[in-house]
Each structure stands twice: as C-alpha cells, then as structure tokens.
C-alpha cells in the first residue's frame, strides 16, 4: 500500500511538471489577478461574455475585441476596455493591439473566443460564407497570437486560451464547415504551444 502511495505522489509531481511546461517553479506564484490584463475576442456575448465576467470577478483588467457593441450592463465597469475590432481583419487586429498596449499595457492572457456558425450542408455553403467562417474561427487566432504573443515572450509570462469545441473531434453532418474550422483551430493551438515551449 505504501508503494502505491509513493507511486501516486511521484506521478502527481510529474503531471504538475508536465502541465507547467517542464518548469520546476510553481507558476501560480507569478500570477496576481489584479495585475493581469486579458484580451477576450468575441467577449460581448455567449461564452466570451461569461469568460469576461469571470475574469472581472478575479480583478483582471479585460480588453474586449468584438464587432458587436458592448452590453449596456458592462459599459460602466471600470475593469473593461472595449475595442471595436473585426478580428478577421489582420490590419484591424494589429492596430487594436497597439491601442490595447497604449491604454492598458501588454496583456498576459489572450482568450481567442470569437467564432461564427450556421448550419449548412457542404453543397449549400457559399464560398463567401466559408471564407468568412475560416477567417473568424481560425485565421483571427493566428492574427491575435502574432499581435500579442511577443509581449508574453518578452515578459516570459502568458497564457493563450483557445475556445474550441467537441466539434474539433467529431463532425456533424449539418456543420461540416464549422467542425473543420474547429479541427484546424485545435491543430493551430497545439502547434503554437509546441513552438512556444521550444523557443521558436
């Protein structure tokens, strides 16, 4: 029984080490919520809005990047800065990133949440809609990572969260376009993580 306990403890330590990108120090000590700045794309509704509210509860300053208007309930909240930004437009993302840095400072958290979907069959999906869906659901993540990851690397501190879906793994007949975009998004996120920890 003692041997199982020891094996369990060692396993737990190795799991913690792996989750901490094989760094020996405890990353939790470096995070002071009231000093953190988070970017949330698509933060004006749905999952993004819920994430914004949770970050605000922890005292994190939040920059919302969205094409929708900020909900009235959040307009007077001191912890929020709203930036109207089409995240599918790379120039808009880089311009907004500069505005965020001037207004709040360099972010330590990036939550890529913006996404769109509408049920379609493969045959009824227009090329315009398909391009828009991939621009918002996939390429916007590329642009925001290019815009904000250098700040995190410079500070040697940061988290990038990708809001994906079970659709990354399983394709529904009526949502092939959406599922394909989420599979691409998962692949991008895993590749970005691998590059980041390898120093590339």
What is each PLM-predicted segment?
Residues 165:
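Residue(s) in the substrate-gating loop at a strand-loop-helix junction
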Residues 125, 171-179:
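Active-site loop-to-helix junction immediately N-terminal to the catalytic Tyr of the SDR YXXXK motif
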Residues 145, 181:
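Active-site helix of classical SDR
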Residues 23-63:
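Canonical Rossmann dinucleotide-binding motif of NAD(H)/NADP(H)-dependent dehydrogenases/reductases
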Residues 113-118:
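Conserved NAD(P)H cofactor-binding loop of Rossmann-fold oxidoreductase domains
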Residues 121-122, 126-131:
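Substrate-binding pocket helix/loop in short-chain dehydrogenase/reductase
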Residues 83-98, 127:
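The beta1-alpha1 cofactor-binding region of Rossmann-like NAD(H)/NADP(H)-dependent oxidoreductases
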């Amino acid at each position: 029984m003692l041997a199982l306990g020891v094996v369990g403890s060692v396993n737990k330590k190795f799991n913690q080490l792996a989750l901490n990108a094989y760094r020996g120090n405890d990353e939790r000590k470096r995070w002071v919520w009231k000093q953190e700045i988070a970017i949330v794309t698509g933060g004006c509704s749905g999952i993004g809005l819920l994430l914004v509210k949770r970050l605000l509860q922890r005292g994190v300053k939040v920059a919302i990047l969205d094409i929708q208007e900020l909900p009235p309930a959040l307009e007077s909240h001191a912890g929020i800065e709203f930036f109207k930004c089409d995240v599918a437009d790379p120039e808009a993302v880089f311009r907004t990133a500069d505005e965020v840095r001037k207004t709040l400072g360099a972010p330590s958290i990036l939550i890529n949440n913006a996404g769109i979907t509408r049920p379609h069959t493969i045959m009824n999906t227009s090329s315009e809609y398909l391009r828009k869906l991939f621009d918002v659901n996939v390429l916007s993540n590329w642009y925001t990572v290019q815009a904000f990851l250098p700040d995190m690397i410079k500070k040697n501190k940061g988290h990038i969260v990708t809001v994906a879906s079970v659709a990354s793994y399983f394709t529904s007949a009526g949502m092939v376009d959406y599922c394909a975009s989420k599979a691409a998004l998962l692949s991008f996120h895993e590749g970005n993580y691998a590059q980041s920890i390898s120093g590339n």
